[in-house]
Amino acid sequence: MGIARILSAVLFLSVLFVVTFPTLLSADHHDGRIDTCRLPSDRGRCKASFERWYFNGTTCTKFVYGGYGGNDNRFPTEKARMKRCAKA
């Protein structure tokens, strides 16, 4: 019975890998990581007010960052955003 469970687990994990692997190769990934410049703006979880810049798909836009959490589509200056997302 123990070998059957192990084989079932291996089969399940193999199928899961085959199903999710194409997502890792999608257009939103670059060199194995999610393309930062395609992420939506995310204020984060705190209530601070830091002016930051993000790329909204077509232009560089200001938003208020709360100081904690959020995602990596957040830059301290427009110039820093342009340097990272120039090819987006």
Swiss-Prot record:
> How would you summarize where this protein is expressed among tissues?
Expressed by the venom gland.
Q: List the disulfide bonds.
A: 37-85
Q: Which residues form the propeptide?
A: 28-33
Task: Fetch the Pfam families from UniProt.
Answer: Kunitz_BPTI
Q: Which GO terms describe its cellular component?
A: extracellular region
Q: Which GO terms describe its biological process?
A: envenomation resulting in negative regulation of voltage-gated potassium channel activity in another organism
The protein's location, in the record's own words, is: Secreted
Signal peptide interval: 1-27
User: What does the record give under GO molecular function?
Assistant: potassium channel regulator activity; serine-type endopeptidase inhibitor activity; toxin activity
Entry keywords, A to Z: Disulfide bond, Protease inhibitor, Secreted, Serine protease inhibitor, Signal
Q: Which InterPro entries match?
A: Kunitz_BPTI, Kunitz_BPTI_sf
Where does the record place the BPTI/Kunitz inhibitor domain?
Answer: 37-85
Q: What is its main location?
A: secreted
Q: Superkingdom, according to UniProt?
A: Eukaryota
Gene3D superfamilies per the UniProt record, alphabetical: Pancreatic trypsin inhibitor Kunitz domain
Coiled-coil annotated residue ranges, if any? none
Which SMART domains does the record associate with it? Answer: KU
Q: Site described as Reactive bond for trypsin, positions? A: 47-48
Say what the protein does. Answer: Serine protease inhibitor that inhibits trypsin at a molar ratio of 1:1.
PANTHER family in the record: KUNITZ-TYPE PROTEASE INHIBITOR 2
- Recorded family membership: Belongs to the venom Kunitz-type family. 01 (intermediate) subfamily.
Protein name as annotated: Kunitz-type U15-theraphotoxin-Hhn1o
